[in-house]
């Protein structure tokens, strides 16, 4: 469930950020594209580092750290008055997503019995696919009906649920 929620947040935000950057911050198309893409740069940087730190600190501590940074960086979307701040928040949010998703993958791989590894990894992957199926739809729907601030508050609430579920 944690993986589904983490990826749902990713898909909710990725489809609305370019629109928000253009409409609210008057970004050009390339600036809006950077605001979307810089998230993945943060994710890649985190994944390059996360494996080493998981070996040192352990999966659970890295998951908690990732969720904490994810929570803080998601709440920071409320305070993005310019493109530089939005890009910084996006990078940090992507970094947190990279830590969290790497930790959850490692935890799942370590707890599934070898005899059911294929089945377990399949279900884990299914949670990602389900998030990809509903996240963009919900993001656009919510942006037009409830607004940007509601989506950010909703994502913060989902991260809190992830934190509760990871204990």
Model segments located where?
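Helix-loop boundary and gating motifs at the non-cytosolic
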Residues: 1-25, 30-32
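Small-residue (Gly/Pro/Ala) motifs that create kinks and tight helix-helix packing interfaces
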Residues: 18, 131-143
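Residue-level signature of mid-helix packing/kink "hotspots" within the transmembrane helices
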Residues: 40-44, 48, 132-133
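C-terminal membrane-cytosol helix-exit motif in multi-pass small-molecule transporters
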Residues: 156-167
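Helix-breaking motifs and short loop linkers at transmembrane-helix boundaries and internal kinks
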Residues: 26, 58, 79-84
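Cytoplasmic helix-loop-helix junction between adjacent transmembrane helices
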Residues: 89-127
